[in-house]
Amino acid sequence: MAALDTFLFTSESVNEGHPDKLCDQVSDAVLDACLAEDPDSKVACETCTKTNMVMVFGEITTKANVDYEKIVRETCRNIGFVSADVGLDADHCKVLVNIEQQSPDIAQGVHGHFTKRPEEIGAGDQGHMFGYATDETPELMPLSHVLATKLGARLTEVRKNGTCAWLRPDGKTQVTVEYRNESGARVPVRVHTVLISTQHDETVTNDEIAADLKEHVIKPVIPEQYLDEKTIFHLNPSGRFVIGGPHGDAGLTGRKIIIDTYGGWGAHGGGAFSGKDPTKVDRSGAYVARQAAKSIVASGLARRCIVQVSYAIGVPEPLSVFVDTYGTGRIPDKEILKIVKENFDFRPGMIIINLDLKKGGNGRYLKTAAYGHFGRDDPDFTWEVVKPLKWEKPSA
């Protein structure tokens, strides 16, 4: 057990071959294709998959000429689903498409059938979204989440570059970190447990799997300072994981929302991101809330921060904005809330402009659909840019 002044916290991740993540990636690949040709596309694209089948369905209004079947097959192929024995054959599986136009009732309420100015655009739905930041890592993200996510990305890297040729696309990771509470801030002490369950071919032994995962996945990802002789490793603890991908489990868009965000830290309003254009505040509201929380922590105003924003369908102004710094703020939270409101425009149309969220192409949203939407060093992740905050510092 951890000492009394410390505690254990666990985050998990799945890599791009997990069936739910496959669906997220297909949905966001469709969104990218729509926005690349028509930045005003309205997209709500869901994907589901099971053995030998992928289906895309939802509501899309776009001037883009989108070949849905081609996008599905390309996305699955790029993940590594190239034959039935790895879980799905991208070139021969069934692809079903059931796409309709956006409801005219929603269209008139949100964007007035494209007649409203940006500042007048209403939220695409009701809901509440959260952004979170913490000073425990350079990314200003929780360490347990960062490590679980990077282990998953590394699994894919060593599969695709041939370092571990026995790997197959599906896989899950989980990291338990021992933390110390420092007046509300979270200070990582050590990694308590590392769990990796990865799909593999028939040829490899469990001993080889464990040795390769330690050498080629865990060692390059987890800093040495966090590992000690007491760290526990569970490497493919079920003993066999040959059947995977959609053959092993059904998949659905929007089933991995905690993996997409903060690994269980902070809070979540419940709305998924993938397959949604930026008028959907589930996505754009969460992105600007992350930028606000990150900017507060990066500025030194707090060591830890959560921001909540809420909306009503068709209404531009948020219903509420909330800030909590968990007792780590240098100034009172009500002052930090004032700074957030003065520096960030939470109206959906203005979020879209300020974060350039209509820009498709370059696989922009597809990139977000695996290995997390936050804490990534990529110019397409505009919400990760720290905004210099304007505020009146109280006189000494």
UniProtKB/Swiss-Prot annotation:
Cystine pairs: none
Record-level GO BP terms: one-carbon metabolic process; S-adenosylmethionine biosynthetic process
Cofactor remark from the record: Binds 2 divalent ions per subunit. The metal ions interact primarily with the substrate. Can utilize magnesium, manganese or cobalt (in vitro). Binds 1 potassium ion per subunit. The potassium ion interacts primarily with the substrate.
Cellular component, GO annotation: cytoplasm
Subcellular location: Cytoplasm
Catalyzed reactions: L-methionine + ATP + H2O = S-adenosyl-L-methionine + phosphate + diphosphate
Pathway the protein contributes to: Amino-acid biosynthesis; S-adenosyl-L-methionine biosynthesis; S-adenosyl-L-methionine from L-methionine: step 1/1
NCBIfam families in alphabetical order: metK
Quaternary organization: Homotetramer.
Name the UniProt record assigns to this protein: S-adenosylmethionine synthase 1
Biological source species: Oryza sativa subsp. indica
